[in-house]
Amino acid sequence: MGQSIEEKGLHKDFLFFVRVDFFDKYVLSFDTGVLSAGYQHFSDSAGTQEIILLTENDLDGDAYFWGAKTYLNSKKIRLGLSIDIQSGGGNTTYDRFSRLDRGKRFFACIIDSDKDHPKAALGTTAKRFDSVTSGFQDRRYFEVLPCHEIENILPFAIVREVAKDKIKGEFVFDQKFLEYRMFVDHKAGVTIGQARVIDQLHGGSYFSVFDDIEEDLGLCPKFGGGLLESCMKFMDSLSVKNAIQYVDESLDKDWVRLSKVVASWGVGGRGLRS
């Protein structure tokens, strides 16, 4: 983001803004919402190309892009997004990340944790990033989701609209228990009994709030692999203006936060259409 955005005060709605340093041409550092970058980083065309958003698959990237557009519109920011969505291909995402990290383009990378419990170990893909520092470093931003995968933080109203019959009676889709949606496997589904086993496996009591409930009742339905795709079809059918109604800053706080991250990286250019 350029100086004009800072001057208009719009930077308050973003995670950060870029300040180009014309004195130290090599500097590249992040501090309290400011990414300071020496002009040398923009002398090569690679440094001025649209930023890359690296995710495990294209559909994840498309969903984050939709979230970023919706975030901008919710803040009445009439600017567009320019993002090059790239797919890492699951476990090979780390290889793609490493190549980008050696390059000259600015990029952000968001991956699933695949954790089924707060105390669980990271999944196979996320484990490969053990040595990578989260947050800002040099030309990139990196984050492992604070939940199982992207399906766990899709806007509540979107999932409710797309799968209203399927989620009926399932506890994590009751607003009272929505926080427990974070680690349940939406693809495989989870019963109360299975949640207890997961607690025992990891030596925790995360799901203990459901201890008095019959174990054969559903915590989360089995969506299979099509939930994200179905949600994306519905999301794409909405105008950006109407999409705002399906995102709640309180219920969907993790989604809104990530949408802000992606919007901060890709904002610029012509205004969004409503």
Give the predicted meaning of each segment.
Residues A37, T48, S134, D138, ...:
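Generic preference for well-ordered secondary structure
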Residues K8, K12, K25, K69, ...:
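Context-gated lysine
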Residues Q3-H117:
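RecA-like P-loop NTPase motor core
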Residues Y26, Y39, Y64, Y71, ...:
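Sequence-level detector for tyrosine residue identity
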